[in-house]
Amino acid sequence: MRVLRVTFLWALLLLVAFSASVYAAEDEPKTPESTSSANPRDNDPVIQEIRGLRNSGMKLNDAKDFKGAIAKLRGAITLLHDRVFGEGREAITDPSDISQDAALYAQILNDYGTVLIRAKQYDEAIEVLEDSVAMVEKIYGDSHPSLGLSLRSLADAYMAKEEYKMAIKKYKTLRKHVKKGLETTHEAYIEASLRIAEGYKKLGNTKKNLKVLKDAVEAQNGEINGLTTGIAELYMELSTAHVAVGEIDDALRAAEVASAIFRQRDGEDTLSFAFSLNALAGVKMRQKKVDEAIKLLEQAHRIAVQIYGEKDPITQASAKTLREVKEYKLDLQAQKDEL
C-alpha cells in the first residue's frame, strides 16, 4: 500500500503541474474591448472612460494586481450604474444605446466577479455574479452565449468557496444551457460535466461522481473526438472514478483511452501524456501487474526528465516512485523465494 500511495502522490504532483498549464489560458491577457468609433456612442466620453477603466482593470488582473484591478472595475461599474439605473439614464434616448449600456454593465459585472474570485473575495463575487446572470437573462433571454459565461463564473465562485452543492446546481444549469445551444459533444458540455463530477467528488459521493462521468461519455453518442477539449480529461477522471468504487477493469479501459488521446492530441513528450502513463501505471498496480507498471513509470519518468531536468521536484518524485515500485517487485520476489 505504501507503493500505491506514492504512485498516486506523484500522479497528484503531475496533476497540479498539468492543471497549471491547462488553466494558464485563464490568466493570459484578455483582449481589450474595442474602442472603435463606428457609431456616436463610441465617442461618448462616459463610455470611453468606462471602457478605459475596464481595460486598465483587466490588465491589472492579468498582472495579478487584484487590488488595483478591483478599484478600476469598481470605478467603471459606478459610472455605468449611474448611466443604466441612475440620473445619467435620462440623457440616453436611443433605445439601442440603452440596450448596449445594459449589456456592457452585465459584461463588466462578470469581469469584476472573476477578479473577485481570483482575489478570494468569494461572497462579493457571488453577489456580483448573481446580478450578472440576472441581467443577462433579462437582456438576452436564456439562449445567449453571454448567459453561459456568467453562469460559469458564478458556479466557479461557489466551487472556490467550497459550497459544492450550490456549485453543482449552477453547473447543471450551465450544462442544460449548453446542451440546448451547442449539444452534448461540445467542449463546454464536457467541461460542465467534469465540474459537476468534481463537485460530487468533493462531497465524497463516489457513485454520483461516477454516474456523471459515465453519462457524459455516453452523451458523445459512441464517438471519441480526441481533438475536442476535455475528452481526454473526461476519460482520465472516469478511470479514477472507477478505481474509487473498485471497478479496476473498467478503470483500465478508461485510462488506456485517455492515454491514447493525450498522446494523439498533445504528443509523446508532454506532461499530459506522462501524467496519463503514471495514472495507467497506478491501475496496473491495482491489478498486481507490477512489471507493466514499471515500464509505464519508466516512460513517464523519461518524459519528466526531458521536460524538467533531473532536479525538479516533479522529476525527483517520479524517480522515487519508480525506485519504490522496483523495490516492491524485489520484495515480492523475495517472498516467493522464501516459500
From Swiss-Prot:
SMART domains: TPR. It holds the Pfam family TPR_10. The keyword Ligase does not apply. Gene3D superfamilies: Tetratricopeptide repeat domain. TPR repeats lie at residues 106-139, 190-223, 232-265, 274-307. Its main location: secreted. A motif (RxLR-dEER) lies at residues 51-74. One of its GO terms (cellular component) is host cell nucleus. Residues 1-24 form the signal peptide. It is found in: Secreted; Host nucleus; Host cytoplasm. Keywords: Host cytoplasm, Host nucleus, Repeat, Secreted, Signal, TPR repeat, Virulence. InterPro entries: TPR-like_helical_dom_sf, TPR_rpt. Effector that suppresses flg22-induced post-translational MAP kinase activation in tomato but not in Arabidopsis. The perception of highly conserved pathogen- or microbe-associated molecular patterns (PAMPs/MAMPs), such as flg22, triggers converging signaling pathways recruiting MAP kinase cascades and inducing transcriptional re-programming, yielding a generic antimicrobial response. Belongs to the RxLR effector family. The RxLR-dEER motif acts to carry the protein into the host cell cytoplasm through binding to cell surface phosphatidylinositol-3-phosphate. This is RxLR effector protein SFI4. The lineage of its organism: Eukaryota, Sar, Stramenopiles, Oomycota, Peronosporales.
